[in-house]
Amino acid sequence: MITLKELYRIGYGPSSSHTMAPRKAATLFLERNPKAVRFEVTLYGSLAATGKGHMTDKAILDVLDELRTTIIWKPKTFLPYHPNGMKFQGFDAEGHITENWTVFSIGGGALGEEGKQNLTFEEIYPMNSATAILAWCMHTGKSYWEYVEECEGKDIWDYLAEVWNT
């Protein structure tokens, strides 16, 4: 199972799929292409169709810099893997492509690539069913919250308190 930090996220709104994930993708792309002088981001399908209202462009431009980034909107083009597709391209000073990366906002602020494992989920729970977890609790004499703390670490409670307060 994934960490509770993935399920309960504090992030850039108003939409986890249309702002949090595109912003995260832009951040990852910038980290991979720090020497790029210009960027081009193509938004496809649902991201392009409703992106202005969800501020998808603002989420991306806040990371990549409005002055050196072009956003291309293709609301009628749906990529085969998922309706929330994005293509990032970086360019060097001579205009050559430094990287071409297609990534998808697959829900809840998470990113995915066709044919690859999810890019953002962290699998930290060794047991994947309530039956297995309850059996562990019975066997160890511990409570469910102790299982959570064992897998997540003691800092999970501070994180969940921050989510609650937000």
Task: Write out the residue ranges for each language-model feature.
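Conserved phosphate/anionic-ligand binding catalytic regions in large, soluble enzymes, centered on
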Residues: 8-26
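C-terminal regulatory domains involved in ligand/effector binding and gene-expression control
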Residues: 69-166
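Electropositive phosphate-/nucleotide-binding environments in soluble metabolic enzymes
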Residues: 19-23, 54, 154-157, 161
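Phosphate-handling active-site elements
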Residues: 29-40
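Short, hydrophobic/aliphatic alpha-helical segments
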Residues: 1-10, 40-41
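A structural-propensity feature for long, helix-poor, extended segments
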Residues: 38-74, 83
